């Protein structure tokens, strides 16, 4: 009867006392980590950075992961922090070239930058990748209209003006435009181009 009540229908235990204690410790550690992450997020969001990673207050390269991990006593892998001279050289090379340099050129750049501080080839490669991504993120999306598209639009507008009567104020020329129903979602508008082609 006692065996049945422990393992059967009347209150079987899923975890041992040892497992429960381990779970309690894990939950406590998780709570501490969450608190540290909230603190880290708040401290990082209050530091203004330029697009290149420069901290305008101190004029040096700011790496939030290095600054935050040392403040909290967490151990992370060492990260490369370029000197101001290295950053200037990298920015100049980026402005001269187009995109990420080839492996041979990365070796040359690394040799040049090593005169101004520690650096590895992968640091140079990643810097160019990140710099390109930052510049793409900053560019507003551009829509270009070719001259033939502009001419087509002008011809269509002229033809429509000829069809509409003077007494209507020109509103009949817009009857062919289909306005989407407010019930349709954004997906309808995004997929519209697929059906036009």
UniProtKB/Swiss-Prot annotation:
Its biological purpose is as follows: Potential transcription factor that plays a central role during developmental processes.
Q: Show the ranges annotated as biased composition (Polar residues).
A: 140-150
The UniProt keyword set, sorted, is: Developmental protein, DNA-binding, Homeobox, Nucleus, Transcription, Transcription regulation
**DNA-binding annotation, residue ranges on this chain:** 75-139
Report the subcellular localization.
Nucleus
SMART domains, A to Z: HOX
| GO CC annotation | nucleus
Keyword Cytoplasm appears in the UniProt entry: no
User: Which domain of life, per UniProt?
Assistant: Eukaryota
Signal peptide, first to last residue: none
Q: Would you tell me the protein name for this molecule?
A: Putative WUSCHEL-related homeobox 10
Q: Which GO terms describe its molecular function?
A: DNA binding; DNA-binding transcription factor activity
Question: Which family, according to the similarity comment?
Answer: Belongs to the WUS homeobox family.
Q: Which Gene3D superfamilies match?
A: Homeodomain-like (1.10.10.60)
């Amino acid at each position: 009867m006692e065996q049945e009540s422990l393992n059967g229908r009347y209150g079987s235990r899923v975890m041992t006392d040892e497992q429960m204690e381990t779970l309690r410790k894990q939950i406590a550690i998780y709570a501490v980590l969450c608190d540290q992450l909230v603190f880290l997020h708040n401290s990082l969001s209050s530091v203004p950075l330029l697009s290149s990673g420069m901290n305008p207050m101190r004029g040096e390269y700011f790496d939030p992961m290095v600054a935050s991990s040392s403040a909290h006593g967490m151990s992370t892998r060492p990260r490369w922090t370029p000197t101001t001279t290295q950053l200037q050289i990298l920015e100049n090379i980026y402005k001269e070239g187009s995109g990420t340099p080839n492996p041979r050129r990365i070796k040359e750049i690394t040799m040049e930058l090593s005169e101004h501080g520690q650096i590895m080839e992968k640091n140079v490669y990643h810097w160019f990748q990140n710099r390109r991504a930052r510049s793409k993120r900053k560019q507003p999306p551009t829509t270009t209209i070719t001259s033939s598209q502009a001419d087509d639009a002008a011809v269509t507008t002229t033809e429509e003006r000829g069809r509409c009567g003077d007494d209507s104020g020109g509103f009949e020329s817009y009857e062919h435009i289909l306005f989407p129903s407010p019930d349709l979602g954004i997906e309808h508008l995004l997929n519209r181009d697929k059906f036009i082609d």
